[in-house]
């Protein structure tokens, strides 16, 4: 079975597009081959800045012959009907078969489609793939109609096996497929022929091209860390930058340079961001001083002077970039020292947050008021929380954040310290944006927690009030992320702040610009949104959705910390034998009771009377219910849900024995009513812990 090698050689492919392009090339080609009847053993896609490559192993040499039977008209049908059938099948009358069925003689056509050779299929699939390739952006060049991310220069398409290699014959807008490619643009630009994937990969390596992006990443990181270690330094990890740089070079050459002394006083985040965003440099820190003192750059070629000229040029460009950053830094510090952070924030009055939610300054005023109200609930000083909220977004008006928006919050913390504000306020300037995602760090300082909650809840309340809710996959204002942030803030800090209590003032503040209609539906809808996000969060931690629903149905479901404690205890309980068996007993009791209440048109909620117990099983269940009630109440009061579940588990054996020996729907009406009331007691006792009717199984 032959192997297939495809290389699409072009001008430089943007690094950010390469990973997706590898996946698309593999999927489009292999799916097309399979749809055409070819099978394969394995496939792998690769990329460098100038080439997309696909290797398919164990490809079948041809597609199978297909035999199709088509039923036609009756043998004695009008000639016109038979002629139409013949045209549709491409057969003649004598090629049809006549078969008997229950309606008489019927004509059948047996159409055989012979298999097609792999080269023919590959050529069709590859041309379709190239013409329909889903680049985020593409271009045309010359006079042809072909579109590609950058001008496509050559196509290598080769089928090879033990007998040799065969070029797949195809021509696309003047490009004819061949068996040759080029090496490194500067170090080995000559074309060379290949006979298969292994030969291709080996010759590329000799021509200074490292084909596999992951290998380039490993080579860059290994060499960078080795050079840093030799000087007692450490490279700052940056996975995204490493992936991007690996997509910029075919033959990585790691070089380390020094940052000028004049710039070492800049905040490390400024140095790292400026070098990463503008120069694609890695930052190198000195563990002894904690400063970023050097940088790592990755060249795309080896040079006779071992990179000295490259480093010199990069150093000049870096100095210019860092001079700009130093200007922004010094200018911002002067503003802070003369006008303070609140003075810096004055410009936010002219910055619109949303055309229906007012300016950034108006939003900050709402967050300040809300942070003051939330502060006592999370153990923070109301005055400190209000002060932090008032200045937390001041750096949005700074020159540094104007140049590097990703430094918002970080620069605010530096400027707050420069202004002499309390450390808790400085920390909150940075931390109030957190957590930014499911794995981001969660603030724990009370002032930071208060401001972070106020920021996110104001955002949610505002957009909810104007009807800008997430729909399907669309969430332009990142409201799902904001809700998850609130959830993680409350749970991580074990906060008992009820969502309804902190959403109410937020909703109130958003009423003023609108009508004064009842906002309760908005508040309830937003609480339901929080519950949906909580379900997703807990499911990722292994708690079933029905367990969460059973706890959401309980009172106080806006206290997320309490709700999660209950859900964790119930989840653990249901994994035990006692939990599983008690659930079955509860469901049996609930089903019998529900059917009886529907049939009789009454609710059996009166207390069962022990004096009507006729059997030992009934008396034992009465005693067990009394004991469980006595234990569950204090356990719930103490929020010891594990103890409440344990008390509930003690009902398992008495309930089992009751159903084994007692007929609930007795002929005696008094006994039947008393036993149904007992089933209600079982339901009511269990319902104090969780709504078990919502548990599946």
From Swiss-Prot:
A single GO BP: arginyl-tRNA aminoacylation
Keyword set includes Ligase: yes
Keyword Cell membrane among UniProt keywords: no
Main localization of the protein described in the UniProt heading: cytoplasm
Family assignment from sequence similarity: Belongs to the class-II aminoacyl-tRNA synthetase family.
Subunit note: Tetramer of two alpha and two beta subunits.
NCBIfam families the record matches: glyS
Name of the protein this chain belongs to: Glycine--tRNA ligase beta subunit
Organism this protein belongs to: Cereibacter sphaeroides (strain ATCC 17023 / DSM 158 / JCM 6121 / CCUG 31486 / LMG 2827 / NBRC 12203 / NCIMB 8253 / ATH 2.4.1.) (Rhodobacter sphaeroides)
High-level lineage: Bacteria, Pseudomonadati, Pseudomonadota, Alphaproteobacteria, Rhodobacterales
